[in-house]
Amino acid sequence: MSKKEISFTEGPVFQSLLRFAIPVLGALILQAAYGAVDLLIVGKFGNASSISAVGTGSSFMQMATFIITSLAMGSTVIIGHHIGEQKPKEAGNAVGTTIILFLIIAVIMTFVLEFAAGGIAHLLQAPAESFDKTILYIRICSAGIVIIIAYNVISGVLRGVGNANLPLLFVGIACVVNILGDLLLVGVFHMDVAGAAIATVFAQFVSVVCSVVVLRKQDMPIEFSREQCRIYKKELGKILNVGVPIALQETTVQISFLVVNSVINQMGLMPSAGYGIAQKIVSFIMLVPSSVMQSVSAFVAQNIGAGKKSRAWKGFYTAIITGCSVGIIIFMVGFFGGGVLSSFFTNDSEVIAQSAAYLKGFSADCILTCVLFSSIGYFNGCGKSIPVMIQGITSAFCIRIPVSIIMSRLPETSLTYVGMATPITTVYGIIFFAICFRLLNKNAAK
C-alpha cells in the first residue's frame, strides 16, 4: 500500500483516523464552499426571490447528491473489506461493478429530474415569487447529474482504499472553478440563478476530467483493468446490501429536510430566504460530524475485514471524543455568531435575522451529531446498514417532520423553534443506536 493510501489496520488509532479525517474534512469544506458560493454571490447581486430559489433548489440537489453518496458508501465499505482481506482482484471487481451501476443510475436520474423539475418545485412549495427560478435551477443542475455522480463515485472508491488526499485535490479544483464561474456569470453577465447553476455543473465537470487524468497515473492497492468494467453479481449483491439501506436512510432524512423546507416556505418569503441562508451555514457546521462518519466507516471496514474488531471499537470511541471536542466550539460559533455568519451571504437585515434565529435552535446538534454519525459510521463499516436505515426512517417520519410542523404552528413561533427539531431528532437517534450496540454486544457474547 502506497503512502497515499492509509492502512487502518496498524499503527496508532488516533493518528490513522486524523490523517484520513483531515483531508476528508478539507474536501467537505471545499464541497460546501462551492455550494455556498452560489448563494453568496446570488445574494449579493440578486434579490430575496433569487436567494429563495437557490436555497430551495440546492436543497433538493443536495438531497440527490447525498443519496448518491450514501449508495456509493456500499462501494467504499466493500472495497475496504477487500483491502483489509488483502484481496486486490476482488477490490478491482467491486470498482468495475460500481462504475457500470452508477452509469445506469446517472442516465435514469437525468431524464427523471429534467421532466419532474416543475413538480419538485411544487412539492417544495417554493414561494410564488421564486417558483420559476427554482425550476430553472433544478433543471440546469439535473442536466449535470452525470457529472455529480461521477465525482462522488470516484471519491467513494478512493476512500475505500484509504486515499482521502485526491478527493481533496479534485474538490479544490471544482471550488476554484465555481467561484470564478459565479463571479463571471452572476456578477458580470447578471445571469442570476441560471448562472449559479451553470457554474456549479461546469466546475464539477472540470473536476471529474482532472480526476480521470490523475487516476490513470496512480498506483493503488487494487487490481483493476477496463475489462473489469462490468457487473459482477457477487460484488453487486454486496454493494447493494450495504448501499441500498444507507441510501434509503439518507433519502428519508433528506426528504424530511425538504418537508421542513416546505413548512418554512409556507411561513413566507423572508423565512424561506433566511432558512436558505441558514442551511448553507449548516452545511459547513455539519462537516466535522460528516468527516467523522466517513472516517469511521473506512476505518471499521478495513479492520473488520482484517478481523480486528477490538481495534474497530477503539477507532469508534476515539472518533466520538475527537468529534465532540470540536463540536463544542462549533456550537458556540453557531449559537452566538449566527447573525455575523449570515451577513456574509446577504445584506438584507430581515433575512439575516431569520437565518440567525434558525441557527440558535439548531446549533446544539453540532455536538450531538458527532455521537450519532460515529455510530452510523461504525454500523456502515461493519456492513450492518439495516439498523442505520431503520433509524433514518423512524427519525425522519416519526420525529423530525412532526416536531417541525408542531413548532411552526406554535403561537408567535419563529425559526428558532423549527430549528430545535433537528437536535431533538438526533437525541432519538443516539438512544436508538445505544440500544443497537447493547444488542450487538449481547449477541457477540453468546
Predicted regions and their residues:
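Transmembrane helical elements of multi-pass membrane transporters/channels
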Residues: 19-38, 140, 174, 203-207, ...
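Small-residue-rich hydrophobic transmembrane alpha-helices
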Residues: 51-111, 148-167, 274-338, 369-391
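Short runs within selected transmembrane alpha-helices of multi-pass transporters and secretion channels
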Residues: 141-159, 167-175, 196-211, 290-293, ...
